[in-house]
Amino acid sequence: MTDLKKAAQRAIELMDLTTLNDDDTDQKVIDLCHKAKTAAGNTAAICIYPRFIPIARKTLDEIGAEDIQIATVTNFPHGNDDIAIAVLETRAAVAYGADEVDVVFPYRALMEGNETIGFELVKACKEACGEVLLKVIIESGVLADPALIRRASELSIDAGADFIKTSTGKVPVNATLEAAEIMLTVISEKNTQVGFKPAGGVRDAAQAAEFLGVAERILGADWVSPRTFRFGASSLLNSLLHTLELADAPKPTQGY
């Protein structure tokens, strides 16, 4: 197997296959569940809006893919600074049966100089999650400033995040290697088991390999696993399957 094929295989096993569109329906989520059970193995998770969790759980059970985790989103996509609402949404997501919750950090508040709200929001949402995995989306493409990306990562980890995630996929700039470098460095400096999730903008096996390479350089060759690294993506899967000669070439897309 070539290095590119190895990267494609790994990226599938590390993927949160995502649909977070305004026109999502039960049928689209059912189709997503079937896609997540690929000829190259299952993705790590699917990521969907909370209201679709019950139908996703039913579908994954029916197709024998119970090991695929169900992730959902809260305080999404704008990263508002109302802690009470973020906590209510997170509790509801857990009640729906989410295995993982991706919550948006109040990044605009941080840009305005308020560090407290972000820390307190993440802390409260982690308490609401209990054993459910909490991934914190810092929206690195909007923060832009390396110092802000670093600070959002630090605050999220200090407040109890299980993962830090680059992006919602709803802004012009999503995952970049530069943001990955900063976020992974913070994880390394804090000597923590917190994971990393680049989301949006990873289009093919070659780009996936670049992100994996940064993670391995900073945190070691044995660090990357579904417990510590995820790709948030939708269109990436078809490209990876094509690299593995298991699907036709994907059509050009502007999607996540």
From Swiss-Prot:
Compartment annotation: Cytoplasm
Active site positions, chain numbering: D102, K165, K197
Principal EC category: lyase
Keywords, ordered alphabetically: Cytoplasm, Lyase, Schiff base
GO biological process: 2-deoxyribose 1-phosphate catabolic process; carbohydrate catabolic process; deoxyribonucleotide catabolic process
CDD domains in the record: DeoC (cd00959)
Catalytic activity: 2-deoxy-D-ribose 5-phosphate = D-glyceraldehyde 3-phosphate + acetaldehyde
One MF term in the entry's GO annotations: deoxyribose-phosphate aldolase activity
Pathway assigned in UniProt: Carbohydrate degradation; 2-deoxy-D-ribose 1-phosphate degradation; D-glyceraldehyde 3-phosphate and acetaldehyde from 2-deoxy-alpha-D-ribose 1-phosphate: step 2/2
Major subcellular site: cytoplasm
Cellular component GO terms, alphabetical: cytoplasm
Cytoplasm as UniProt keyword: yes
UniProt-listed Enzyme Commission number(s): 4.1.2.4
A Pfam family annotated for this UniProt entry: DeoC
Physiological role: Catalyzes a reversible aldol reaction between acetaldehyde and D-glyceraldehyde 3-phosphate to generate 2-deoxy-D-ribose 5-phosphate.
Protein family according to the UniProt entry: Belongs to the DeoC/FbaB aldolase family. DeoC type 2 subfamily.
Name of this protein: Deoxyribose-phosphate aldolase
